[in-house]
């Protein structure tokens, strides 16, 4: 179990000296666990995840002729209206999970900041390199990165879903395909008719698979006082 912050680190991410923090493996492990815990809470709080048994039963009863279409539609409607919000909650877990994996393995999750806009300079090269592959925390010292050269913003989900990052993160292929699709969908314009078209038995199966994956991560859950 990861331990809570020590050595005077602030709990507010904006106040943390990240150059120092990245050299403290115990603290990185704590942060990774905290990301897992926060993301898991959001995922489990998604309306559609909480309602998976109800939705599964509704589709089954409709197929078996136990309930008519209007009744099934009425049961599914609340999940359609909340689907975009639930997509965000689902993606938040996987974004946090992937950042936590990178931290746990000793890689930088923050973007680099170059005030010179010189792509050939030291930081410019790190920015370019980060778009192609994860940057190990050791590079911060090797490249003499200063606090002001590390952005408060972290890398985005699209980058972490790339093959070069997945070589380290290693989401299972079936999980990865579903997460990519949900992430792409949440970045589109949304209408209720589109959400209704997405919500079906195939999506329910996919969400059950994601839910099972999330449950497997409970061993990495951390609490602030642990």
Where are these regions (language model features)?
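Short, hydrophobic, well-ordered secondary-structure elements
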Residues: 78-106
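Short, contiguous, well-structured surface segments enriched in hydrophobic/aromatic residues
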Residues: 25, 29-61, 96-103, 124-150
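Charge-rich, solvent-exposed alpha-helical interaction surfaces
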Residues: 18, 51-61, 122, 126-129, ...
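Generic structural signal for well-ordered, non-transmembrane alpha-helical segments
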Residues: 20, 24-27, 84, 88-92, ...
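Charge-enriched, short contiguous segments at helix-coil
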Residues: 109, 163-226
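Short, charged amphipathic alpha-helical segments flanked by flexible coils
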Residues: 102-171, 201
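Short, charge-rich amphipathic alpha-helical segments embedded
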Residues: 60-68, 103-107, 218-220
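Charged alpha-helical initiation segments
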Residues: 1-85
């Amino acid at each position: 179990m990861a331990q809570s912050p020590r050595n005077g680190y602030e709990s507010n991410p904006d106040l943390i000296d990240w150059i120092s923090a990245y050299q403290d493996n115990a603290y990185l492990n704590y942060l990774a666990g905290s990301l897992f815990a926060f993301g898991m809470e959001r995922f489990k709080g998604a309306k559609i995840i909480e309602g998976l048994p109800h939705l599964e039963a509704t589709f089954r009863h409709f197929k078996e002729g136990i309930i008519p279409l209007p009744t099934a539609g009425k049961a599914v409607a609340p999940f359609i209206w909340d689907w975009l919000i639930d997509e965000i909650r689902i993606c938040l877990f996987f974004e946090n999970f992937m950042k936590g994996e990178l931290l746990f393995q000793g890689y930088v999750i923050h973007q680099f900041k170059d005030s010179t806009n010189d792509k050939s300079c030291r930081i410019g090269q790190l920015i370019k390199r980060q778009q192609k592959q994860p940057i190990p925390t050791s590079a911060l010292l090797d490249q003499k990165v200063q606090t002001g050269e590390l952005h408060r913003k972290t890398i985005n989900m699209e980058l972490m879903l790339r093959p070069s990052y997945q070589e380290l993160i290693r989401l299972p292929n079936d999980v990865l395909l579903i997460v990519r699709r949900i992430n792409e969908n949440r970045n589109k314009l949304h209408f209720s008719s589109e959400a209704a078209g997405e919500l079906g038995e195939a999506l329910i199966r996919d969400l059950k698979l994601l839910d099972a994956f999330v449950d497997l991560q409970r061993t990495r859950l951390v609490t602030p006082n642990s």
